[in-house]
């Protein structure tokens, strides 16, 4: 909360600037001289008109502004940003969804949808949960798992693509992709992750970027995103309230035989171990629920699991003792 208080005034001025660049439809649209950028792509990305990825990110930014306004006690700002976000969100599907393509199109120019479909707006809309479950599943098939859609070749943006798949329960497929893509860099001799990686390139092609033969960064922080995915979607640790005052833990093996890891929080570490029969969870501070998928009632050393639905249980954790759970897949 203290950190948000420090940043909030600058967040407001930034959002005021963005709001000042919206068109008559309330959507952000590039002006002459603007560099509209989402990713380095090995193909043509049209930047004309209203871009779907830009509106989805703009909407999420307004929602985040409302959340931060609430944290700092700015009730007027909260109401303002909530209204702006809700208004824009209501326009996303009517503007960009194409039933024939079963996806968001890339842009709308002069009131007409383009024929192009790219991954960006579609994957963002999935893990922002801007679409219903049926349309999210449609996007998985028509976009995320469709090799004919322009591929993403930067580790940073691949992270969002894989997060969308994780959000759809595809951890096993994502694990294979992480091993192939980030593992591909390691096989090329990488000791740190690169700014851009195209598995189809060979030799010194991997070093070229920006029109220069050795222009690529081979130690790029934005390439480290598997760490986030492993913590959130495999170890399953997420904040429920600001600063992890309350947490949720929902481990998923995702094709692994076992896993073990620690997620640091402001209140201390949350340690998770899981194999096909056992979970071990230890949270040094804070409180929250551990979700357990089990055909039969799980056995635990501390506490009593509560049945949430068929095959799903949860255990409340409010002390630092290790919880040991035996479950049945």
Map each language-model feature to its residues:
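Repeat-solenoid scaffold signature
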Residues: 149-188, 204
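Flexible glycine/proline-rich, aromatic-decorated loop/lid segments
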Residues: 25-41, 135-143, 182-185, 189-203
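Active-site acid/base region of carbohydrate-active enzymes
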Residues: 1-54, 72-122, 188, 244
